[in-house]
């Protein structure tokens, strides 16, 4: 992996030499074959000196410079979007009572205006990196604010954000400004000069690790059996596959198995010359699909930009050489690169030869240690056991992408006054701007500590905080993630020790998933089901909404006692037994068996069913009137079905209003779906334009505040209102936008009625 043939000098033993000298030894033949395949000989690995010489071999800087430019350009696009510059004032507004989740509790956000300055420095650093202007300084200006913002909020961590920081860190130590850079125009030593081979080795090794470790992680049984991304095959991108395969087989064979094979093989396909063309086709198709399937920002495009790194280092020169001569004057140089002090040259290049210096040894050490560290970190969870829950480690550096999908059915936060013993309940997520705290013990501890500091403002003394969080991972039963009996404020947590109040994942119940799918498929369209598993000695307190007029509970395994709170009745259920639950009342389900219990709620939203029937009747009536089969006049309250709501006319009934709202929504969806490609592209551009416009205007306001002081509140309010305008969008679209598309934390959908909070 360390070396690529396209970046190496020609092997000393060529095919021509072998033909002229058939008596050559087999060792030389093997060596030349190895050089053709890997780009180096065994002799290059025979000693430390040879390895240093190999990794500092002079290499064309063109390919590296193209990646530098593309990566930095994508970071310029990323900063207002996924880094959150466009919504920075919503996240870090001064004076907010907000619980935050930094990696280290000592990390705190700066005042809002200073946070805008941090983002401005990061943006200027990315711009300088892209242009190759004051390159090393620009890399630092981007890198330090990036990692500060990254470590400030664990809830926004993901694998690709981590990868961006790693790539920026690597580029900081490289000579990526030796081609196609402003620094090259200002310094003859840097202009079109060689770079050491290790610059490519580190980047190629990083991308190889991302692919390969992601594939190894997908060897997990849940992925291989098709449970991780079970519903992804419903996306329109997989429609061609569903012409010959069922949706279930498309999910298993195309989404899961092909995804596994691609990740395992992508690095190898890109590395070898013979397989690289097919590798480029596969990974390009893969990342283009990902850009449509997931909201993952610039990640697909960064990976697309990294693919040419595996090609020969001089490919940009060959491309420039094929351009018209007039255009070549505006493009980077096509001449051969010059010698550089960063590289080690052999006697053929330097008369007296060259011995590696300290910088060459340091570059080699950095390469080897960095790649070893990247291979170790995804499996270092035995050291950071405090971050292990049902999945291992801090999410974001393990490359276990898309392996685990979660659904949260029920979240309840209970507080107890430490002096009076009074109980109360909090809305899940109160004082937070994220939802990821539900899945991680470290964040839950930070959240409980923060709540214990905020609740005294609301006359709660020495608060104790308890969490009851129910999660399903990869279509298993809904079960508790944390022990609801433990006061998390006083609970022990350490990053290096196992968290005792994390409940184990009930892996023994995994085979039930096939049965659960059969049960779901046997129900009609109006019937819903929720599968629950609970531990012995615990109970679930639940409320059945009045809308759920037909709700029952059925035991699948173990033994439970159901208490109807209002009726003060208890009923014990054994395997296969079921009972009806009254709507509009609380009940408790106690697990009394010695092993975990498994049961399911089966319910019908009778209110919704009745509404659907009424709306279907109105739709049928409207169609009959329009086609002439209904000749009688409509009553006044139903006239809006044909004419719409008329000012001054009779007030439509609530049912008719609901029908009209649905019709308008369906018409808008249909209009957007059938809109021409250029119209969709225009909407996309306008949304992005708003994000960048707001980012620029809010940054300008904050920098003005730092330089000249804050103006009056009235002026600030006017400036922010102007920044929030959408002057480029049609009036109907901009007014219909109830939420800002740049907000990275949209509101969480309501939980199912059957598991609403107390």
From Swiss-Prot:
Q: Which GO terms describe its cellular component?
A: endoplasmic reticulum lumen; endoplasmic reticulum membrane
Its record classes its membrane topology as: Multi-pass membrane protein
Reaction(s) catalysed by this chain, per the record, are: 4-carboxy-L-glutamyl-[protein] + 2,3-epoxyphylloquinone + H2O + H(+) = phylloquinol + L-glutamyl-[protein] + CO2 + O2
Q: Which residues carry this modification: N-acetylalanine?
A: 2
Q: What ranges does the Cytoplasmic topological domain annotation cover?
A: 2-60, 135-136, 314-361
Residues that span the membrane, as ranges: 61-81, 114-134, 137-157, 293-313, 362-382
Tell me where it mainly resides.
Answer: endoplasmic reticulum
Annotated GO molecular function terms are: gamma-glutamyl carboxylase activity; peptide binding; vitamin binding
Q: Where in the cell is it found?
A: Endoplasmic reticulum membrane
Question: What keywords is this UniProt entry annotated with?
Answer: Acetylation, Disulfide bond, Endoplasmic reticulum, Lyase, Membrane, Transmembrane, Transmembrane helix
Ranges facing Lumenal side = 82-113, 158-292, 383-758
List the cysteine pairs that form cystine: 99-450
State which Enzyme Commission number(s) the record gives: 4.1.1.90
This protein's superkingdom?
Eukaryota
Does the UniProt entry include the keyword Endoplasmic reticulum? yes
Checking InterPro entries in the record gives: HTTM-like, HTTM_dom, RmlC_Cupin_sf, VKG_COase, VKGC_lumenal_dom
Signal peptide per UniProt: none
Q: Region (Disordered) spans which residues? A: 1-29, 727-758
GO BP annotations listed: lung growth; protein maturation; response to dexamethasone; response to manganese ion; response to oxygen levels; response to parathyroid hormone; response to Thyroglobulin triiodothyronine; response to vitamin D
**Biased segments, Basic and acidic residues type:** 742-758
Member of which family? Belongs to the vitamin K-dependent gamma-carboxylase family.
Remarks, anything else? Answer: The vitamin K-dependent protein substrates of carboxylase have usually a propeptide that binds to a high-affinity site on the carboxylase. CO(2), O(2) and reduced vitamin K are cosubstrates.
Subunit and interaction comment: Monomer. Interacts with CALU.
Role of this protein: Mediates the vitamin K-dependent carboxylation of glutamate residues to calcium-binding gamma-carboxyglutamate (Gla) residues with the concomitant conversion of the reduced hydroquinone form of vitamin K to vitamin K epoxide. Catalyzes gamma-carboxylation of various proteins, such as blood coagulation factors (F2, F7, F9 and F10), osteocalcin (BGLAP) or matrix Gla protein (MGP).
This chain's protein is named Vitamin K-dependent gamma-carboxylase
Q: Which organism is it from?
A: Rattus norvegicus
Q: Source taxonomy lineage?
A: Eukaryota, Metazoa, Chordata, Craniata, Vertebrata
